[in-house]
């Protein structure tokens, strides 16, 4: 999947909730590629948080995960302003890893 293309497509259609989901999946992929987490399809977000518990990434990943779960699993619509805030948070974190 071309995450950048799909994220931009979802955002341009106003589907910010899907864009947040895609950013989260891209983040997991990038973290696994950098050996920061051990990705497995059947692992939960809590599993990844536990892997990061004693690392410098934990606090930021916790916040990103909370925002993702709130919007995706809580089925809350994400406004454009909220999306920009969340996107910036993702980008800053990805620049650190």
Predicted segments — roles?
Residues 4-97:
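Membrane-proximal, non-transmembrane interaction modules
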């Amino acid at each position: 999947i071309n995450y950048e293309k799909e994220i931009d497509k979802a955002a341009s259609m106003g589907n910010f909730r899907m864009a947040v989901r895609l950013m989260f999946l891209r983040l997991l992929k990038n973290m696994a590629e950098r050996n920061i987490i051990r990705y497995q399809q059947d692992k939960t977000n809590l599993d990844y948080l536990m892997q990061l518990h004693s690392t410098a990434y934990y606090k930021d990943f916790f916040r990103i995960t909370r925002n993702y779960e709130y919007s995706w699993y809580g089925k809350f619509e994400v406004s454009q302003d909220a999306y920009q805030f969340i996107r910036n948070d993702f980008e800053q974190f990805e620049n650190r890893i």
